[in-house]
Amino acid sequence: MKKKIIYISVIVIILIIIIFLMKFNYKKINFGNNESNKSANEVKEYILNINSYTAELEVTINSNKNTNKYILRQEYVSGDIEKQTVIKPENIEGIEMSYKDGNIEINNSKLNLSKIYNNYPYLSDNVIWLNSFIDNCKKNPENVNVYEENEYIVMELNLTSNKYLVNRKLYLEKGTGKPKKMIVQDDNKKDVIYILYKEIDLNKK
């Protein structure tokens, strides 16, 4: 009888340990160096409160004419810096675009803004900026949907003001809360812009 009680006690203790470990690891999100359990909505709030970031991104843009791919570096500090530099392709490498008060300044290039608009669609558009996505989410909270999809938490924004840029989805890594990719679709659900975040640092400044 005594052995039976000991056996049952051991099983109960093991079950308690297993349950504790399962709860501890359930939906663990790592923001910086602090690990804690975060729901999808908490991740959403984390993203909406980003005030600075630096990123290297691979951007694929599908226009009516062709498909263009770029490697870009972006630097953003709320109220101060909003700068984008082209790394690839080589023929426009080094072009730097600075944004301030709704105006765009082109540096290190013989191309003017009208040529960039015509030859490189969306390259100078704020739709490829993470902070633009965040601003639109804040202005249109009723059009934002947050859900889990495989290994991602997805923030989906639907706006009908531009038929070419109706649906935007930001895919966030569950383990870190970091943006991994963004997809922008038109009203026919065709991918217009695909952004892959190769590197990104959030709120470093």
Predicted regions and their residues:
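Short, solvent-exposed coil/turn segments at beta-strand boundaries
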Residues: 49-54, 74-82, 98-103, 150, ...
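N-terminal leader/targeting segments and the immediate start of mature chains
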Residues: 2-81, 204
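Amphipathic hydrophobic-ligand
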Residues: 66-72, 93-99, 163-164, 190-194
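A short, amphipathic edge element
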Residues: 133-145
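An acidic-aromatic
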Residues: 73-127
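Gly/Pro-enriched, hydrophobic low-complexity segments
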Residues: 146-205
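A generic structural motif
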Residues: 58-62, 85-89, 107, 158-160, ...
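Short Pro/Gly-enriched beta-strand edge/turn motifs at strand-loop
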Residues: 55-56, 127-128, 153-154
